[in-house]
A protein has these predicted regions:
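C-terminal motif of bacterial Sec signal peptides marking the signal peptidase cleavage site
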Residues: 18-21
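Active-site-proximal loop/hinge segments that shape catalytic or ion-binding/gating pockets
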Residues: 15
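Core segments of small alpha/beta cavity-forming domains
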Residues: 61-139
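Bacterial N-terminal signal peptides that target proteins for export
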Residues: 1-10
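Structured, amphipathic secondary-structure segments that form assembly/contact surfaces
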Residues: 108-109, 114-222
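Bacterial signal peptide processing site
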Residues: 23-26
């Protein structure tokens, strides 16, 4: 979907809602009328993330993050050398897999959703999933994530994972009819994300998304 400034209810009525950010920062925290991972036109949602078919990655941390074959989240990035940043990047990807697993399963209660998110990050995930459910949509196609960077806090327990996302080939699909809501390529296909990942105090190597910031119509990602 593409970015709109309408209230969520109105955006849904127009079938063009898109969720942006939860949390404070440079991006507007209240700018939450965009559904991640879908192209947004007059009929459909539009935006999202890595190939989900890698068997070895289906159950990281014992959590099932597998997705349907037609829901392909691609994370086209290289792991950083620092161990904590590499782990945070992996779980930032799992955070997005969890969101779209929730979309597919039609629930915010799936373990993949709750394992990789906390605080504002969990609120963001729940809002995303509920927007898709309320709209009667699931997702299909390929959502590509790329040009990732990482930055660690001095204490080593917080990492910012930033990246671009291209949802030009990722579409909404009506659950009842199976109709794919195609959209034309546009600047609205490109988003720039900053995810604040924090290390779980008891989970061995587990990182959770605590805040999500999104710059929509991101020309630098084109």
């Amino acid at each position: 979907m593409k970015r709109r400034t309408l209230p969520i209810a109105a955006a849904f009525a127009a079938a063009t809602l898109m969720l942006t950010a939860c949390g404070g920062g440079d991006d507007k925290a209240g700018d939450s009328d965009k559904i991640a991972g879908t192209g947004q036109g007059t009929e459909k949602p539009s935006k999202s993330a890595k190939p989900s078919g890698a068997p070895a990655q289906d159950k990281p941390d014992g959590v099932d993050v597998s997705l349907p074959a037609d829901m392909n989240l691609v994370f086209d990035w290289e792991k950083p050398k620092k161990e904590n940043e590499a782990a945070a990047m992996d779980d930032a990807a799992n955070f997005f897999r969890g969101i779209y697993r929730g979309v597919d399963k039609r629930t915010t209660k799936d373990a993949a959703v709750t394992a990789y998110a906390t605080g504002d990050g969990l609120h963001y995930a729940n809002t995303q999933i509920n927007a898709w459910i309320d709209g009667g949509w699931t997702a299909t196609g390929t959502l590509r994530h790329y040009d990732a960077t990482t930055r660690s806090a001095a204490n080593g327990t917080s990492v910012e994972v930033a990246f671009c996302a291209d949802s030009g080939k990722f579409y909404g699909k009506e659950v009842k009819t199976g109709k794919v809501l195609n959209t034309e390529p546009s600047i609205e296909d490109f988003d720039y994300y900053r995810i604040i990942m924090i290390k779980h105090p008891t989970g061995d190597g587990l990182w959770q998304a605590s805040k999500v910031f999104v710059e929509t119509k991101a020309a630098k990602c084109r």
